Amino acid sequence: MTSTVSGTETSLRSLRDRPFELLKELEKRSRAVTVGNAPQTSAGREWVGVAFRMGGETFLVAREETREVLGYPAVVTRIPGAKGWVKGLANVRGQLLPMLDLRQFLGSGATASGRNTRVVVVNHREIPAGLMVDEVLGFRRFAEAEFNAEAPPTVIRCDSYLAGAFRRGGEVWPVLSLKSLVESQSFLQAAS
């Protein structure tokens, strides 16, 4: 048993610098342990998203719209003539990725870079983008029956990019559509 625990710790440690892969591995292991113990939802189907904090608010993005989650890169090269919310380009495993401050793009001030700051990489075929957020909270699962197409009001002005919300108990989780965001004219006009 000790060797199994040691092997598990080692493989998880190897994912320490790749937060999204770490979350996926933890999810996989959790599912393996709870297979057969998990209650079926009345709706039968579930929605999985990545939860993150921006300002003082929490949001969700669909797992399918998220390629990965990164720590904020140590080196980001500024792009002359770009708007303030365009932080620059980062070399991520040999690929150039535009780094963008999501909160600043939405007009709610700049995101302070700290140890919890993360970059949510958008899973879009034509528009590569890394969106800087205050913190990623991990995966959240909801029954489809918990979804409401009416988005709640938010302090951060992002209404045109909200695709509804999930409600559970007293909590409301607005769903931000990354596809709508990156395909919007405001987003595509990054030059100042």
Feature annotation, model-predicted:
Residues 1-192:
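An acidic, low-aromatic, low-complexity terminal/linker signal
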